Swiss-Prot record:
Keywords: Membrane, Mitochondrion, Mitochondrion inner membrane, Transit peptide
Taxonomic lineage from the root: Eukaryota, Fungi, Dikarya, Ascomycota, Pezizomycotina
Transit peptide: 1-48
Highest taxon above the source species: Eukaryota
Ranges for region Disordered: 52-86, 293-322, 528-548
Subcellular location: Mitochondrion inner membrane
Species per Swiss-Prot/TrEMBL record: Penicillium rubens (strain ATCC 28089 / DSM 1075 / NRRL 1951 / Wisconsin 54-1255) (Penicillium chrysogenum)
Protein name as catalogued: ATPase synthesis protein 25, mitochondrial
């Protein structure tokens, strides 16, 4: 029996314990074995892997005697005094100490929690770092900003990086389960595939790979539909005590309630996808722009508070943004008070003088028939210097010039508050676009914000006029201290804010007019008004505006050209003609010809004015290669138009100028070596002779 027991005990420790059990029954004290030496520890194994032949060999008596002799006998009273609780516990009954797997947590690993945050935000940050193992955590407080509607309102965004695609999916799944179990929330993970769905997609992917390998084809693995490296976990509203208000209480028409709590969104990326998307840079720039806007508005409020006594709003067109308004009892200025301006009517405002010849009566009758719309149209058609003179000293000036007196007093009572706000916004747009030093772009943007805040319906053309005015550069002739501190980056930020608000109101901002404005804003520093005759046809040299492009401007123009070619922009014939000229002046000749070819594809006929513009632009450019391309392409197309373009009028001179650029030696050649363009030149001369 003892042999069978010893055969079952494979390891040395088990054999020793079996031997002790028999010896203790016989009454012979047997000391416990001493701790194993370093040699026995090095040869020990956690799990027995002894072969069957070795386990069948019984232990020799010499081994047992050696263990008994090597053990030192302790005193007899120590064996008796040892309590039962201190007896030896076998290794298979010993409790292992728990292994701490928590990541070291310091303040540098977790972002700073903003004020008035939900209580669970700190716990969520610790869980995402310690339990999920996300790195490079960042927190963005987007409450109060205009963000995409899919994320909700009052959003706090957390961005983290996963170590791999598998870690990405596991972390998102665990986070959703944790939010459901701990806080009873209903999170939604956009981009996370379920376990069964993932198996199905992997099975289909393997099937496609086998079919492709059998056919000898390659499988495009760029976008397999399994993972994008980016999962957005939207936890929804996390404030348990969030207040609820009626929509009508916050000025929104409709029915239902509005939750004013805080939403939490966790964006989980792989390292490559996070660097590619650069969501951190997007929101950092947005928060920085919003901070500069708050500082600018607070500075304006302080400056306007102590600017002087508030004026009356008796003219009905409101006041500058930030000015206090109150009730008044002042009488509206009558037209009879303007009779003293009759002698200077034509001299001070030439547009009115031109209209007075067709209108009966004196200057008062002329002024009475001028509406604010017609006055603004006349102001927009004036030269820049004359327009700046008519606008007076600034937004506070309403009496210094005849235009201001007519604009602020004529028919003010006949228009609604919305029409008056539209007239005022148009006036500020024209003033900024005409580069008046007193009308700043910040004031224009504040007027635009007040217009939207009042709930007025903004016409699309007026919104685009505001964007164009904000992108107008400051020329050297009218630079002031205010304009010097106003950088082009700040102008672009204001213009993008206007476009964002227009987009939120449902205005289609991807159109040819916007691209025309953007191209003009990029190319504007290269066209100065001090050089009115910079590129004439007889110069025969490229336009200096194209040559002086910097590297940053070339990169911006290249990006605009790619967007214009890829985007599906609605075609508008009027805006397309203006955009073609702008593209050519900015050096985007491929974009010019691409837009030129779209006219017949969109069912629009090209007119004689279009061909005159075509030949004139290439003649002013002064490049022989492009002039030859223009002649070889444009002249045959004239006969294919419906109706055909006849060779008469201004198009004849435009073609002749283009021929001189394509072949400057045409008139110096003899009859033996005539020019290729000589037949066309002769035809143009005959057309000129017929007209004379």
């Amino acid at each position: 029996m003892s042999r069978a027991l010893l055969r079952g005990a494979a390891c040395q420790g088990c054999r020793h314990e079996v031997l002790r059990s028999f010896v203790s029954v016989s009454g012979i004290p047997m000391p416990r074995s001493s701790p194993l030496s370093s040699r026995s520890i090095s040869n020990s194994r956690a799990f027995s892997a002894v072969t069957v032949l070795r386990s069948d060999r019984p232990p020799s008596s010499n081994q047992i005697d050696r263990h008994l002799s090597e053990s030192q006998e302790p005193p007899a009273h120590s064996e008796a005094n040892t309590p039962a609780s201190s007896q030896h516990v076998p290794w298979y009954l010993q409790e292992e100490a728990p292994i701490v797997k928590d990541r070291p947590l310091t303040e540098a690993h977790l972002p700073q929690i903003p004020d008035d945050s939900p209580e669970m935000l700190s716990t969520l940050l610790e869980y995402t770092y310690k339990d999920l193992g996300l790195d490079h955590l960042k927190l963005f407080d987007l409450r109060g900003l205009e963000i995409p509607a899919a994320l909700g309102a009052n959003v706090i965004m957390i961005i983290g990086t996963a170590r791999s695609v598998k870690h990405l999916n596991v972390s998102a799944d665990r986070l959703c389960r944790w939010l459901r179990s701990q806080y009873k929330l209903s999170p939604y993970a956009d981009g996370l595939l379920g376990r069964n769905e993932l198996k199905i997609k992997l099975r289909r992917k393997a099937k496609r790979a086998r079919a492709a390998s059998a056919a000898g084809a390659m499988v495009d693995e760029k976008d397999d539909g399994i993972t994008t490296g980016w999962i957005c976990v939207n936890a929804g509203m996390v404030d348990k005590g969030a207040t609820t208000t009626q929509l009508s209480d916050v000025g929104i028409e409709g029915f239902g309630n509005l939750d004013l709590g805080t939403s939490v969104v966790v964006q989980i990326f792989t390292e490559e996808k996070r660097a590619d998307v650069d969501l951190d840079g997007l929101w950092e720039a947005t928060l920085a722009r919003e901070g500069r806007k708050d500082i600018r508005e607070s500075t304006e409020d302080l400056s306007k508070t102590g600017a002087g006594p508030p004026r009356s709003t008796s003219d009905g067109f409101g006041s500058i943004p930030g000015q206090k308004r109150g009730f008044h009892t002042m009488r509206r200025l009558a037209l009879s008070a303007m009779n003293s301006a009759e002698p200077g009517l034509e001299a001070g405002f030439p547009g009115v003088g031109a209209s007075s010849s067709a209108l009966p009566g004196d200057a008062a009758e002329v002024a009475s028939q001028l509406t604010p719309t017609s006055l603004l149209q006349i102001l927009a058609e004036l030269p820049a210097d004359s327009a700046r003179n008519e606008l007076g000293s600034g937004p506070n000036d309403r009496q210094s010039t005849l235009f201001l007196r007519l604009f602020y007093t004529n028919h003010a009572a006949r228009f609604s508050a919305q029409e008056k706000a539209i007239f005022r916004l148009k006036l500020f747009s024209i003033a900024v676009s005409r580069q008046h030093p007193a009308y700043t772009k910040d004031t224009l943007f504040s007027t635009f914000s007040d217009f939207l805040r009042d709930g007025y319906d903004l016409p699309d053309d007026l919104g685009f006029d505001v964007v164009s005015a904000l992108l107008t550069p400051r020329t050297a002739g009218v630079v002031t201290e205010q304009s010097e501190t106003h950088s082009s980056e700040a102008d672009m930020e204001l213009a993008l804010l206007v476009l964002d608000r227009l987009s939120l109101r449902g205005v289609p901002i991807l159109n040819m007019r916007i691209f025309n404005i953007l191209y003009q804003a990029v190319c504007a520093p290269k066209t100065a008004p001090s050089k009115p005759t910079e590129s004439r046809p007889e110069e025969g040299s490229p336009s200096w505006s194209v040559v002086q492009q910097t590297e940053s401007q070339k990169q911006t123009l290249s990006r605009l050209s790619k967007i214009l070619a890829a985007a599906n922009i609605p075609f508008d014939a009027v805006d397309a003609r203006q955009l073609m000229v702008t593209l050519f002046q900015c050096g985007d000749y491929d974009g010019f010809w691409r837009l030129w070819r779209q006219f017949p594809l969109k069912g629009v006929n090209r007119t004689q004015e279009d061909y005159v513009q075509l030949f004139k632009l290439h003649a002013e450019l002064g490049e022989e290669v492009r002039a030859r391309e223009c002649l070889s392409t444009g002249v045959p197309l004239m006969n294919q138009e419906s109706p055909a373009i006849v060779l008469q009028g201004p198009i004849v001179t435009a073609i002749m100028h283009c021929i001189l650029v394509a072949d400057p030696t045409l008139q110096d050649r003899d009859e033996e070596s005539p020019s290729f363009y000589m037949p066309l030149w002769t035809e143009c001369q005959e057309a000129l002779a017929r007209e004379n």
